[in-house]
Swiss-Prot record:
Function noted in UniProt: Component of an export pathway for enterobactin.
InterPro entries recorded: Enterobactin_exp_EntS, MFS, MFS_dom, MFS_trans_sf
CDD domains: MFS_MefA_like
Localization in the cell: Cell inner membrane
Species annotation: Shigella flexneri
Protein name (database record): Enterobactin exporter EntS
Periplasmic topology ranges: 43-55, 105-109, 178, 234-250, 302-307, 372
HAMAP family to which the protein is assigned, alphabetical: MFS_EntS (MF_01436)
Transmembrane portions of the chain: 22-42, 56-76, 84-104, 110-130, 157-177, 179-199, 219-233, 251-271, 282-301, 308-330, 351-371, 373-393
Gene3D superfamilies for this protein: MFS general substrate transporter like domains
Amino acid sequence: MNKQSWLLNLSLLKTHPAFRAVFLARFISIVSLGLLGVAVPVQIQMMTHSTWQVGLSVTLTGGAMFVGLMVGGVLADRYERKKVILLARGTCGIGFIGLCLNALLPEPSLLAIYLLGLWDGFFASLGVTALLAATSALVGRENLMQAGAITMLTVRLGSVISPMIGGLLLATGGVAWNYGLAAAGTFITLLPLLSLPELPPPPQPLEHPLKSLLAGFRFLLASPLLGGLLTMASAVLVLYPALADNWQMSAAQIGFLYAAIPLGAAIGALTSGKLAHSARPGLLMLLSTLGSFLAIGLFGLMPMWILGVVCLALFGWLSAVSSLLQYTMLQTQTPEAMLGRINGLWTAQNVTGDAIGAALLGGLGAMMTPVASASASGFGLLIIGVLLLLVLVELRRFRQTPPQVTASDS
């Protein structure tokens, strides 16, 4: 990568076939999950007219993901990671089929939506952890920043496309189409993943799973990179259906709300060329997080939905910068034998923030207007973020030696 370039270098997709297969599978998977992500809150909102119920579904799914990430972290450090990935994807597809069949019933079951959310949240997180742990083996640690940015770009571009498609499907065909296409896409991802080489974990002594997990906790707590970053602001999506009523948005326009954050994040990934050369990544990560919280606070105050979309896109861009820096610092400083557990714990931190935020925002939405709920969450997190900036001294002062630019990077 040219040292002076802000643009992302995509050469890994050409030089590493296994990473290219993961890229393709992840893109298809994210598009499929995006269709699901639009359908579930809209269906629950239509059935219950309650933001609290929408928040509960996100919280339950987040809780299942937390457990799955804990289990998946241990499994990824003990067992062949390719098998874990394939198992997780296949079982998720079964859950999506269940959601589709439930939506086709004359009176869909709300309980079934909650239970299938638990199922999909648990098994999806198993695959996420194993994929993250296998990344360094697929591309080499020297390429982790580049791989992380490409991965983020894959996720965000898929997340931009799928909500808009999902919104159009909701307006024309109903939620069953979203669920059915999500299931089909999930099973299609198995095809490129089957071409992956075996991904065995590094040799290490066998120990009790809980003891193994505690070892990961101890390492993470001893790391100066424990940022304590809160991601609750991204849980504002539980208010989208209610805010759509406030802004008098159509079903198709709701999709733009869901697409705004990943669009901003995609721009952040595309312009991440210089992030690897940041001398103080910890400080940059904290400042970008503060900016993202401010964007969420302003989001709910916008008089028109299009201005709200701009605020969400800004949040996505700043969040992308923060997430990419945190990802790279953790991956490069974590021993290979602990990558599964550390990635599981790190991702669980984000999922926990989203789940707690969804529950709080759902409750606020029941007591306050959606506009007030969104603004209160953003400005509240901004205050907490300023305190974190002052308290997390080691992270704020953390310095790294910028990587040397090689001929292959130019």
